[in-house]
Amino acid sequence: QRWYTAVVIDRLMFLWFLQEKNFLDNQPKYLQQRLQAHLDGKHTQSFYKRFLSPLFFKGFAQERTPETRAAIQAEFGQVPYLNGGLFAQHELEERYGEALDIADNAFQKLFAFFDEWEWHLDERALKSGKEINPDVLGYIFEKFVNQKQMGAYYTKEDITEYIGKNTIIPALLGKVRAEHPAAFDALAWPLLQHSGDAYIYPAMLKGVDVTYPPEIANGLDTEGPDLLARRKPWNKRADERSSLPTEIWRETIARHQRTREVRAKLAAGELKDVGDLITWNLNIRQFVQDLIEGCTDVTLLKSFWFNLAGRLPRHSHEKFRHGLSVLDPTCGSGAFLFAALNILKPLYDATLRTLQAVRADALMAGDTSHPEKWAEVDELLARFAAAGSDRAQDYAVTKHIIVHNLYGVDIEKQATEIAKLRLFLKLVALLEPGDTIAPLPDIDFNIRHGNTLVGYATADETEKAVKGATQGNLFSDAWEDIRIRLVAVEQQYNNFQIQQVQHGGHVSAADKQALSATLSELEKMLNYHLAREYGVNTTKAKDFDVWKSSHQPFHWYVDFYPLMAAGGFDAVVGNPPYVEYSKVRDLYQVKGIETLDSGNLYCYCIERLSVLCRDFSYSGLIVPIAIGSVSDTNKLREACSDLYGSLWNSHFAIRPTKLFDGVEQRLTILIGYHGSSDGAWHTSKYHQWFSDERPDLFSRLMLVSMPPRLSKQSPWPKIGSLVEARILEKLRRFEASPAQLLLTDASKWVMYFHRTPGYWIRMLDFLPFFESPAGDRSVHHIRELCATSEAARSEVAGLGSSSLYFWWFFAIGNCRNLTKGDLLGFPAPRLDADGSAEIVRLFHALMKSYKDNSSVKTRAKASYQEFDWVAAKPAVDAMDEFFANVFELTDEELDFVINYDIKIRVGDVAEEI
């Protein structure tokens, strides 16, 4: 019932947008008027059966012929023939037929609710709070319907755009270069080398050529004396000419230094690999557009086009070639697919424009040689020119992208309906009243419902399942039958896509039914084999149906056969569910997952990339930061070592601001290349940022090469500068952790710490005051450790209280909960007698400073001791100066440690310390 309700509401929302643009009988309130006329007529049949259902399946889905045109207009008025999957009979309608009905009062309430809103098809900024556009539909679904049930969160456009462009465009460039390496290199890398600042984002360029004030410039020399004192002014807010919102001079200078480094590498011609565009965070969208528009080599242009759009067969012996395939395996309401469409559309347009210009130049020059070279160009230009107006051509190009480039799967049926609806609305938004609406695409075979993690994904898995691991050739005939049917699937699937984008072409209900029937038979057969692997007695129909309903298997190898048979998808993007496996295990189980111990569905989705991504493809996912830091994901990190040839990670905190509103998730964005490479992995720092920084958050990302990992399971560092890399290497010189020798199970040398650090870590030799009706200790937050001696306690607690350890906790740790294991993992040398005496003195001074700078606060019914960390920071700095000598840090490295994230940690008083 929920599913069919979503189907009907999706159709009605689509029609509501149409009537707002006068596409329904030129009436902006077409549906309301038809409902009122029905109610006034006091008909015995419901509005749904008498008018709405016929409108769906006859008015919008029946092709106009001389015999039907007049009758359709007489019954429904002037309404467009839309075709497409939205108004084809849904599987629920085929299953239940006449039994489906909806009461009139449901439509009265729904239409009244719709009438309260302003409906817009464009992407204007929303002002009134009562406006609805296609983006809002996705937000509403993810925010209020899907989030709590499925661990899915609405992904904002800046995230989808960053991930999308850095996976889709590198995949395209890689495919074109593979076909024409010499021609590509001769065009691409000189363009980049001589581009100046064209591909450096404006945020990175802000103030880069402005002269620094003398007191700021005084801190640039890292070799001179008193570096920390000379750099003290760097904690002041930078001036507006030089800075981005909220920047202090320390951040502004780091950004400027990075920009100058990029400029130098560009000018020297050092950046000449597709991955460099990601590593140095260049404007990859503008680069590829300029690359295409500056190309005069028709062979290279055709390569761009056919790798983008696919190649329709021109002769009977030719095979259909698919375009760049972009998959979101957990697509939700389609946020990433929408972003992919917006990324691909300008590339289609640029390639068409450039082909048209190059062809015109050839004709003007009288070039009649090699007619076959131009034949396909002439045909594709004619196909899109036949659309007529610019808007109609935009419609044709957008439709082509939706049909030939975008694919999605989701376990939530309603999500896939919303995703398809948003793509349909994107098409209609291109038109104006009076335009003819070309038939909508049918993308029921592009956007699919099912469980990404349950089902056969490869030929080997499918063959093994059908033949049986121990049954010899008993099922060989069955496997051969499947292979024969898959050949038919490929032909039907390809024809289904081809027919939709050829001018005047359309897909009949019979075409769709034939493909659906073939797929259904294959799915039924594979479900039978898979259920047996799960121990289900398939002879008991009820048990079999319950298993199918709970597991919702999706057989990638069959359902996307033409793509999977060719090796997989070119670009995989998405935001997989962050759900602990234990919470869904009673509903469904996953099998064949090597990372099962990781215990979270997002981990299994990452492992699934190994079969979904073709060789030399790219993927981009946003996942919890735990992937790179906790022991539970050791096996996943090991798998990633084999999965990715190159990897680009960026990391984001939840304080002061978070990427997902209302969701407490520290996040990592993974951009990965699935092919052989030099194995270079790159990482950013752990970003703690303010909301004012969001507009430039992704355009000013700075990545550095990740230091060599100690093992495949080692934590992934979260660092963003060479200074941090040097500090990390100095720490790693010491294999042993002193805490392993200095801690014991019980003693009088107790230290206390808060398990969830905010902007600093306090390790104390006294229990902070806490009083509430529940007790005299904050049992949920305060943890304790015991040391072997006073000196041992001072060393462990002093190190734990330092800014050096605070940085290390975020660079290597889980960024959330501080544990004994985190302390045991910190490498350091043992102190000699003089060092032990000094650390005891420094620790006593720090404890005195904490006590002197504390007060008792009351919140609700609890009273607690609050510490002024800013006032105590000089004592913390003294601790860091001590450990800087221990680890042989340079003044530049010590300056970084003492001032690590200083703006976030101390706020507006940063300039005073």
Please give the residue ranges for each predicted region.
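Signature of N6-adenine DNA methyltransferases within the class I
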Residues: Q1-F87, E91, T155, F338, ...
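Extended charged low-complexity segments that act as oligomerization/scaffolding linkers
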Residues: H194-G196, A362-A392, A396-L406, D444-G450
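Non-catalytic DNA-recognition/assembly elements of restriction-modification systems
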Residues: C331, H529, F698-S705, R709-F753, ...
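Glycine- and acidic
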Residues: Q1, H120-K127, E142-K156, A186, ...
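Preference for the N-terminal adenyl/adenosyl cofactor-binding alpha/beta module
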Residues: Q1-P346, A357, N405-A415, G450-L453, ...
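Short, hydrophobic/amphipathic alpha-helical patches that form generic packing surfaces
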Residues: D10-Q19, S53-K58, E142-K143, L421-V428, ...
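Basic, amphipathic alpha-helical recognition segments used for DNA target recognition
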Residues: R783-G825, D832-S849
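Long, amphipathic alpha-helical stalk/connector segments used for oligomerization, subunit docking
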Residues: I482-S508
